[in-house]
């Protein structure tokens, strides 16, 4: 994860209370300064601007999108709001310290100077992750070890106990980002990645991450005011994210966050945010969301996820079918078609794809005139294969997969091309 450097900030902590004697266990929570805190929200590459727009809407200041995420400022409780409401961010990182460095020991001192025992108790497990761009240091593993040592040493100076390391499911995630000359220390307020909403209870990962699905809807300006159709819905990630948008459901309402384990956690403030979110939710209207998949198991999974979000009423409001996409009529006169088709990661037979693409193009021309069709794919040959020239192509990353979100304006008998595809897959 590439976390960009941020401008040096003035000290952000309140005046330090008297430090506890070494070997004692009584540590009071240190209040966070009312002055603006600095945060960074990483996101899937390609979604930085729509995340920036989302953060502005959530009340963030000094919003600065950069490659891989968005920096922003605000009161500490803004971190609560962003964790609860951001559909696009992957995490919310709270900046704790920053300085220039030349060697590992300066990074150790930077981390050692953070008052960790006043942030969380020694009962919480920790994980340290170090990322770098153009750092002169030769071993990030050694830097990771020294940052862990700094945290442990700070605890041992204050009390008899120290936090344990848990690299799989830690309570606290500490992120350090290095540039060629600057080190920045962050604490992850989210805990588990924010795309883990809580409605996918089978424990299985989706082919399309939830925040990428929500980000694509934002890129296409979908706000719940026009029909949405996913003809290859799989387990329903796009449809479920769309339902949450249309119903104004906070994406983090079903999960917990790491900030709830911090000593300075303001439970009343967070409970108020949750109550406001619950009061703002609304029912899903029928005739808005349409989904299909040729797999009965996929359709059943989609229904379960919709039920987990809004109960049976929500699942019943979404029109779901199980059929070959090419046999379907348009579910409405027009709207947004958004889908994640197979592209080798889900169908291993390239020959099958090559014969399938023309059938998709014929179906789009025959049945879907008046719609905008958008497909995210790692296969650059999709536009030429279906015989349409994309009106837009947006680079996106689905995990490690370098993808394109192709958009096609569908007009009966127009903008169709049977020419060989351009090397970039545009059909131009």
Q: Which sequence ranges carry the predicted segments?
A:
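Basic Arg/Gly/Lys-rich low-complexity intrinsically disordered segments
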Residues: 1-35, 316, 366, 408-428
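Non-catalytic nucleic-acid substrate-recognition regions in nucleic-acid-modifying enzymes
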Residues: 24, 28-172, 427-428
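Conserved Class I SAM-dependent methyltransferase catalytic core
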Residues: 38, 42, 46, 284, ...
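A short, flexible beta-alpha/helix-coil linker loop
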Residues: 133-136, 192-193, 342-346
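SAM-dependent Rossmann-like transferase core, predominantly class I methyltransferases
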Residues: 185-219
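Conserved S-adenosyl-L-methionine
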Residues: 208-329, 346, 350-352
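Short SAM/SAH-binding signature in class I
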Residues: 334-340
């Amino acid at each position: 994860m590439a976390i960009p450097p941020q401008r040096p900030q003035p000290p952000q902590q309140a005046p330090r209370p008297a430090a506890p004697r070494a070997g004692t266990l009584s540590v009071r929570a240190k209040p966070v300064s009312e002055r603006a805190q600095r945060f960074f929200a990483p996101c899937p590459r390609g979604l930085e601007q729509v995340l920036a727009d989302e953060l502005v809407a959530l009340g963030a200041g000094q919003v600065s999108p950069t490659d891989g995420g968005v920096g922003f400022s605000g009161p500490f409780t803004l971190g609560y709001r962003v964790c609860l409401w951001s559909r696009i961010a992957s995490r919310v990182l709270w900046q704790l310290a920053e300085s220039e460095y030349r060697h590992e020991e300066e990074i150790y001192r930077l981390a050692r100077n953070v008052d960790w025992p006043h942030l969380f108790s020694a009962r919480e497990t920790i994980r340290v992750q170090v990322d770098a761009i153009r750092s002169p240091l030769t071993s990030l593993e050694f830097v990771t070890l020294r940052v862990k040592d700094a945290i442990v040493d700070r605890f041992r100076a204050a009390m008899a106990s120290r936090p344990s390391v848990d690299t799989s499911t830690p309570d606290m995630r500490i992120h350090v980002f290095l540039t060629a000359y600057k080190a920045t220390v962050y604490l992850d307020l989210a805990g588990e990645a924010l795309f883990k909403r809580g409605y996918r209870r089978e424990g299985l990962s989706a082919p399309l991450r939830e925040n990428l699905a929500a980000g694509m809807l934002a890129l296409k300006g979908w706000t719940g005011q026009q029909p949405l159709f996913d003809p290859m819905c799989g387990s329903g990630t796009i449809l479920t994210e769309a339902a949450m948008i249309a119903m104004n459901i906070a994406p983090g309402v079903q999960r917990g966050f790491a900030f709830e384990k911090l000593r300075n956690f303001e439970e009343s403030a967070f409970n108020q945010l949750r109550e406001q979110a619950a009061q703002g939710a609304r029912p899903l209207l029928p005739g808005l969301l349409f989904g299909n998949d040729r797999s009965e198991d996929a359709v059943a999974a989609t229904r379960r996820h919709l039920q987990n979000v809004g109960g049976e009423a929500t699942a019943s409001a979404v029109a779901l079918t199980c059929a070959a996409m090419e046999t379907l009529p348009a579910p409405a006169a027009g709207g947004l078609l958004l889908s994640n088709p197979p592209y080798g990661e889900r169908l291993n037979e390239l020959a099958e794809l090559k014969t399938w693409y023309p059938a998709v193009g014929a179906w789009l021309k025959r049945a879907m005139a008046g719609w905008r069709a958008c497909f995210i794919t790692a296969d650059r040959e999709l536009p030429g294969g279906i015989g349409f020239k994309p009106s837009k192509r947006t680079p996106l990353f689905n995990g490690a997969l370098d993808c394109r979100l192709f958009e096609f304006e569908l007009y009966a008998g127009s903008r169709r091309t049977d020419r060989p595809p351009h090397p970039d897959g545009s059909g131009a």
